[in-house]
């Protein structure tokens, strides 16, 4: 079988790699765009901290009606309000999903860092096994194990966190969960296929870089743009942001595109070692 050497220069000069990375970023962005919405809605939490010893002022700041003696009572009243609970629990779900993705990245780092996939692929190729056999015996089991780890951690977080599904509007919770499951599938496919098509450590760096960008970008946008003033002027409406149904649809499409493109790149590579 012919041998193709992939150097850092050749990889960074390949437009297909950037296209694959752009698809991953799009999946992350559309799936976690609610972080910007959530952070905007909770932009006043820092101000609330100043009224920690004055529950009445904190309640007015949070838009909660009633008489309260402690901040715990204010917080419970805020969370129990159906109009607001959805955003609180969505933030919990997003943070739990990010923790689950971190476990998947750590698992991938251990697998790739030890060279398990590369050594095993080389052995199969030397024995005359075809590329489909390599994918069937190595890549697909790896992708499955990584997904199970991520989804399992998410299920564990859901089991231990105080998430009350009944506080979500009808259909909101399952669509949010579906969106995250699709995003984790896109991320796993990106890492696995890119590790085979290009280089494992490049895939790890791109994956971590994309995750870091998604985590930092909403906060940077929120600090750079006067969202409060724009909203008061009617120029920015958080209600115009994509909802869970739209984000799930976009994430599904991006997942499919990323998987197909990644598979095409990996199958075109002449050397998997």
Regions found by a protein language model. Give the residues of each.
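Helix-loop junctions at the membrane interface of multi-pass solute transporters
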Residues: 111, 122-125, 266
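Juxtamembrane membrane-interface segments at transmembrane alpha-helix termini
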Residues: 34-37, 214-225
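Short helix-to-coil transition segments within interhelical loops
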Residues: 124-132
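Junction motif at the cytosolic side of a transmembrane helix
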Residues: 7-10, 254-273
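Secretory targeting signals
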Residues: 21-118, 135-212, 236-252
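Aromatic- and glycine-rich beta-strand/loop motifs that create alpha-glucan
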Residues: 1-24, 196
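Short hydrophobic, aromatic-rich alpha-helical segments embedded in or entering the lipid bilayer
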Residues: 222-239
């Amino acid at each position: 079988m012919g041998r193709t050497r992939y150097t850092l220069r050749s990889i960074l000069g390949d437009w297909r790699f950037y296209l694959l990375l752009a698809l991953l970023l799009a999946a992350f962005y559309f799936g976690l765009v609610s972080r910007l919405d959530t952070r905007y809605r909770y932009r006043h939490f820092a101000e609330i901290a100043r009224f920690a010893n004055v529950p009445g002022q904190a309640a007015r700041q949070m838009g909660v009606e009633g008489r309260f003696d402690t901040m715990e009572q204010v917080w419970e009243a805020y969370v129990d309000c159906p109009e607001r609970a959805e955003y609180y629990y969505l933030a919990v779900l997003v943070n739990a999903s990010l923790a689950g993705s971190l476990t998947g990245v750590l698992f991938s780092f251990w697998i790739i860092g030890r060279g398990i996939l590369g050594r095993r692929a080389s052995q199969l190729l030397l024995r005359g096994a075809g590329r489909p056999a390599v994918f069937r015996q190595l890549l697909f089991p790896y992708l499955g194990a990584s997904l199970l780890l991520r989804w399992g951690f998410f299920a564990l977080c859901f089991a231990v966190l105080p998430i009350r599904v009944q506080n979500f509007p009808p259909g909101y919770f399952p669509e949010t969960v579906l969106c995250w499951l699709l995003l984790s599938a896109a991320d796993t496919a990106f890492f696995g296929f890119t590790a085979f098509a290009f280089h494992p450590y490049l895939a790890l760096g791109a994956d971590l870089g994309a995750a870091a960008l998604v985590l930092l970008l909403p906060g940077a946008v929120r600090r750079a743009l006067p969202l409060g003033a724009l909203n008061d002027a009617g120029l920015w409406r958080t209600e115009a942001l994509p909802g869970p149904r739209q984000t799930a649809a976009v994430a599904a499409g991006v997942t499919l595109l990323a998987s197909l493109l990644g598979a095409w790149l990996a199958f075109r590579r002449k050397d998997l070692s």
